Amino acid sequence: MPSALPDGEPMPEDGSLPSHALAGAGDRPLGFYLHVPYCATRCGYCDFNTYTATELRGTGGVLASRENYADTLIDEVRLARKVLGDDPRAVRTVFVGGGTPTLLPAADLVRMLAAIRDEFGLAEDAEITTEANPESVDPQYLAELRAGGFNRISFGMQSAKQHVLKVLDRTHTPGRPEACVAEARAAGFEHVNLDLIYGTPGESDDDWRASLAAALGAGPDHISAYALIVEEGTQLARRIRRGEVPMTDDDVHADRYLIADSVMAEAGYSWYEVSNWATSEAGRCLHNELYWRGADWWGAGPGAHSHVGGVRWWNVKHPGAYAAALAEGRSPGAGRELLSAEDRRVERILLELRLVDGVPLSLLAPAGLAASRKALADGLLAPGPYEAGRAVLTLRGRLLADAVVRDLVD
């Protein structure tokens, strides 16, 4: 089941933000994340805030149903307009995630996007993305999305091998994600991503190479590759504990990452974040870069997180409770956190060190600067950028990114 919400102070019922959060807003990009919390089935490795029809039965009634969801989410978009006041910014990015957004009719996703356009306006070059499961779209659906303003789509491929997909409880067949890329291109999508997962129990190096070859052969301009993390409370964790499938160790994850980086570099893809590769700067995911670079975004939907001007908040998780709050004219926010200058400095290091241009050494405290010199000597930071005043991870540093970050912020 979904993980717990963080601790924090209560969110005001009207969703209002302190004045300092809105000061200078015009100088920061603004994005929207729209969460669609519905899935046809729950994948065994997933602990995201998503719900199947069975899980929702009797827990929220009509308010929790996906049939009314677009209208409910649009209510939060209108709340965002009230909270942000006369904020002049046009929205730079919109990302619809889940869950499985494409379980909703394409017309619902288009209406949600239209609400943002009506309330805020969209930048002329706005990036508009939706996630999609390969089995939940067809050419007509993709054409409707493209005609409605979406210009980027991200397909959950995960693997090209049937036995790996089976362990992950994915329901699409091998070959379907690659066909989806062709269908998306035919519909006019400018940018297409494929998500891959490595380190699934039972996956071999050859399986992983085959998945990479299939993904690259489809011709997306962006590929994300993530190590499988086995979260407590998931079906996969229970299967591993019972000895039904083996646990993959960190050395295997490292080997698979090295394979991915080498194969993608040969194919003309460059890393720009530890888990993300693109064929060009234009192919990068601008929405994720808003997160990584500490910009402003409003997260709408159950369990969605937001950040504006150093204030971070999160919504109630259950779709029924979320819809009930908005129906009563209340913010669905469950809590918030006011970030101090030190919080923001540390968070910037945590996020930006994972990027290809790293972080300025001037951000580091004395202890972190000393740690950076050791990381440089150990081959974890690149010497050229370091001499120019930036901490940038080497390939070996990317393998140990979490440890390097911890050392630099301590």
How would you label these PLM feature ranges?
Residues 1-33, 40:
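Flexible, acidic/Gly-rich N-terminal and inter-domain linker regions that tether
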Residues 377-388:
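A short, conserved structural fragment
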Residues 35-50:
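Local cysteine-cluster metal-coordination motifs and their immediate loop/turn environment
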